[in-house]
């Protein structure tokens, strides 16, 4: 057995020992707390009274609102301006133009069946007298998806180029995906006000993780042989990324765009309430 293997085995044993000792200490402390408390079904108040987590969170929220609300409201004004411009365009445009904008890309990429479905959908919006609210939802959805794709692809590219950045981003993306929408929907409303801005921000948080993950995955899955061949012809890092890796990762990136659209659609209906 080599020296490296011995070191790896020792490191693994040390980690296991630390893990089991930690489990034992936590279990012993929990058992002690359950014994000293009169009611074993209630956590000891001697700890909860000292650890005023809710009060700390409320104090932090009040501090941020009092001192930094102007920053969030300034950012919200830019988002709101973009949303209102897109909404006004959709609402004031002829319905036949909106139908064409929906049907022509569908015809080009999905065929005649998808184009007919899009035309029927647009016609249905008008037939049930839901045209204006449909255009508002379409504007909110469109801006959210565009921003999600832009920032998601950028973060995915950065993540693919740095293992450290990827490890930093992973727990954040996991939190964004598993956290219920209401958890960040209402704080966004408090900081950014009522309107399109908090709805767009909440949709961004919910819809960005798939495009970030799949962009990162697609670039990292480009074969080493392809990269070595490009390097042998003198390609630098910039050329490798934008002329080799990203074009070859496009199927994965487009899958991320698909998932982002679905995630945004799932939340945009809820977000319209604010």
Task: Please report, for each region that a protein language model flagged, where it lies by residue.
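Juxtamembrane membrane-interface segments at transmembrane alpha-helix termini
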Residues: 127-138, 152, 212-219
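Hydrophobic/aromatic residues within the transmembrane alpha-helices of Major Facilitator Superfamily
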Residues: 179, 191-192, 204-208, 215-219, ...
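Transmembrane alpha-helices
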Residues: 201, 205, 237-271
